[in-house]
Amino acid sequence: MANHFRTDRVGMEIKREVNEILQKKVRDPRVQGVTITDVQMLGDLSVAKVYYTILSNLASDNQKVQIGLEKATGTIKRELGRNLKLYKIPDLTFVKDESIEYGNKIDEMLRNLDKN
């Protein structure tokens, strides 16, 4: 049970740090406007699944952002190592967060129901 709290706490710290690193340290224009929405940690803290959103819904922009984040992974891990007191910095996997788009789709469906 205590391990669950640790993974949540480490995930929140990584989320905060990665957002800051993307704003201040990563100069790649492909990752401008990226917001980290959630980080899910593996139980042993070896892997962090980092969920992100972007302002654009274009597929080409999504692909560019994904490539930019993958290229910036080394820089992000290095900065995390400097800022966090962890024995081993987890491997980072970036995943586009679809929950906001899904929520918008549900809202639109509900509005359409109200009109009918």
Swiss-Prot record:
Localization: Cytoplasm
Keywords, comma-separated and alphabetical: Cytoplasm, Ribosome biogenesis
GO CC annotation, single: cytosol
Cystine residue pairs: none
GO MF annotation: an example: ribosomal small subunit binding
GO BP terms in the entry: maturation of SSU-rRNA
Role of this protein: One of several proteins that assist in the late maturation steps of the functional core of the 30S ribosomal subunit. Associates with free 30S ribosomal subunits (but not with 30S subunits that are part of 70S ribosomes or polysomes). Required for efficient processing of 16S rRNA. May interact with the 5'-terminal helix region of 16S rRNA.
Listed NCBIfam families: rbfA
Binding partners and assembly: Monomer. Binds 30S ribosomal subunits, but not 50S ribosomal subunits or 70S ribosomes.
Family label: Belongs to the RbfA family.
Protein name: Ribosome-binding factor A
Organism: Streptococcus pneumoniae (strain Hungary19A-6)
